[in-house]
Amino acid sequence: MARTPTRLLIAASGTGGHLFPALALAERLPDYEIEWLGVPDRLEQSLVPKTYPLHTIPIEGFQTRLGLKTLKILFSQLRAIWQVRSLIKKRQIAAVFTTGGYIAGPTILAARLANIPVILHESNYIPGKVTKVLGRWCDTVALGFQGTASYLPGTRTTWVSTPVREQFLIPQSLDLPIPETAFLIVVAGGSQGAVALNQLVRQSAPQWLEKGIYIVHLTGENDPEADSLRHSNYFSQPFYDNMAGLWQRANLAISRSGASTLTELAITCTPSILIPYPFAAEDHQFYNAQVFAEAQAAYLYRQNELTAQFLSELVLDLWSNPEKLAAMAQQASHLAISDSADLLADLLRRKSQKDSF
C-alpha cells in the first residue's frame, strides 16, 4: 500500500524573521501535508501560499507588569492551548514545527498534550523567552547560531543554521535599470521598516550619488518621508519581492540585523554595515550582528553612534576599497549553511515520519 503523507503543522507568525525560515522548510517537504498556524491580521495572511491551509488564533505576548491585561492574556494563552490541541486532533497532525514568537508557546504545550513530536527553530543568537522556558519540552531545538547552545542548558539542541528560501540559492536577475558595472548599495530595514535608519541613509546618500553609486532603499510602509529624495540612481520602495536578486547583486548592504536577513547576507556573500534595531527584545539584533562583526564580515554600529557624515565616509571608504569588500564577502560565506533547510527537513523526518501500510 502507498505511504500515507505525514501531516505537519507549522506555527510561524508575525514577522519575516519567523515566517521565511518556516517557508524555506516547507519548500523542502513536498512529501508532507502542511497546514499553517498563525495570528489574525499578521504578515502570514499575505506570505503563506494558498496551498497550505491557514488556521489562526488570536493571541498576544505577556506584559512585563502584572495587571488586568496580563490576566486576560494568560487566559487567552490557556484558551489557545486547547484550541491548538483541538486542531491537532481534528486535523490528525503528526508533528509540529515552530519558529518561536507568541504562537509558539501554546503550540508547544498543545503538542506535548497530544504526545506528538515538536521541533523549535531558534534563529537568534540570544534565544527568546519561549525557547528558554519551553525548549526542554521540545524534541529538538534547532539553532541558527552555534553559540546559542550555551544559553540553553538541559535542552536538546543541534546547529543547522537558518533556512533560506530556494531562490537565494539560485542566480536571480533584477528588473531595475541598474548597469551591470555600477556599484550598488541595498538598504533594508527589515519586514517592519526602520524610519530612523531611513533618515540616516537619506542624509548620507547625496555624497554617494555624486560618485555614481546606485542605491536601492527599502523603506517599509511607515516612513512619511519615503519619497523625499529623488535621483536617477536612487530607487525607493516599501518592499521588493526579489530580495534574493537584490542581495546577489549588491556590492554592499546597510541593514538591520534580524537573523533571517543575516543568513541571506551570508548565503549571498554580501558585505554589510549592520545597524541593529535598538528596541529588539533582549537586544537580540545586536548579538546577532556581533557574530558577523567578530568574523570581519560586517561593520557593526549602534544607531545612536552613527551620524550621517560618519556613515557617508565609511561607505565611500569601502567603495574605494574592493579588496576589503571581497575579504568581507569571503568571511560572510562561512557564517551560514546553504543546505540548512534540507538539514532541518531531514531532522523533522527522523522525528516524525512513520510508515503507513
UniProtKB/Swiss-Prot annotation:
Keyword annotations of the record: Cell cycle, Cell division, Cell inner membrane, Cell membrane, Cell shape, Cell wall biogenesis/degradation, Glycosyltransferase, Membrane, Peptidoglycan synthesis, Transferase
- Tell me the GO BP annotations in alphabetical order: carbohydrate metabolic process; cell division; cell wall organization; lipid glycosylation; peptidoglycan biosynthetic process; regulation of cell shape
Q: Where in the cell is it found?
A: Cell inner membrane
- Any one Pfam family match given in the protein's UniProt record, by short name: Glyco_tran_28_C
Please spell out the taxonomic lineage of the organism that makes this protein.
Bacteria, Bacillati, Cyanobacteriota, Cyanophyceae, Oscillatoriophycideae
Among CDD domains, the record links this protein to: GT28_MurG
* GO CC terms, sorted: plasma membrane
Pathway field of the UniProt record reads: Cell wall biogenesis; peptidoglycan biosynthesis
Residue spans making up a coiled coil are: none
Tell me yes or no: is Transit peptide among this UniProt entry's keywords: no
Q: Which reaction does it catalyse?
A: di-trans,octa-cis-undecaprenyl diphospho-N-acetyl-alpha-D-muramoyl-L-alanyl-D-glutamyl-meso-2,6-diaminopimeloyl-D-alanyl-D-alanine + UDP-N-acetyl-alpha-D-glucosamine = di-trans,octa-cis-undecaprenyl diphospho-[N-acetyl-alpha-D-glucosaminyl-(1->4)]-N-acetyl-alpha-D-muramoyl-L-alanyl-D-glutamyl-meso-2,6-diaminopimeloyl-D-alanyl-D-alanine + UDP + H(+)
How is this protein positioned relative to the membrane?
A: Peripheral membrane protein
What does the protein in this record do?
Answer: Cell wall formation. Catalyzes the transfer of a GlcNAc subunit on undecaprenyl-pyrophosphoryl-MurNAc-pentapeptide (lipid intermediate I) to form undecaprenyl-pyrophosphoryl-MurNAc-(pentapeptide)GlcNAc (lipid intermediate II).
User: What EC numbers are recorded for this enzyme?
Assistant: 2.4.1.227
Signal sequence interval, chain numbering: none
Protein name listed in UniProt: UDP-N-acetylglucosamine--N-acetylmuramyl-(pentapeptide) pyrophosphoryl-undecaprenol N-acetylglucosamine transferase
- Organism per entry: Microcystis aeruginosa (strain NIES-843 / IAM M-2473)
- What Gene3D superfamilies would the database entry show? Glycogen Phosphorylase B (3.40.50.2000)
- Transmembrane ranges, per UniProt, are none
GO molecular function terms noted in the UniProt entry: UDP-N-acetyl-D-glucosamine:N-acetylmuramoyl-L-alanyl-D-glutamyl-meso-2,6-diaminopimelyl-D-alanyl-D-alanine-diphosphoundecaprenol 4-beta-N-acetylglucosaminlytransferase activity; undecaprenyldiphospho-muramoylpentapeptide beta-N-acetylglucosaminyltransferase activity
**Highest taxon of source:** Bacteria
**Recorded family membership:** Belongs to the glycosyltransferase 28 family. MurG subfamily.
Question: By its UniProt entry, which InterPro entries does this protein fall under?
Answer: GlcNAc_MurG (IPR006009), Glyco_trans_28_C (IPR007235), GlycoTrans_28_N (IPR004276)
Residues annotated to bind UDP-N-acetyl-alpha-D-glucosamine: 15-17, 124, 165, 191, 285
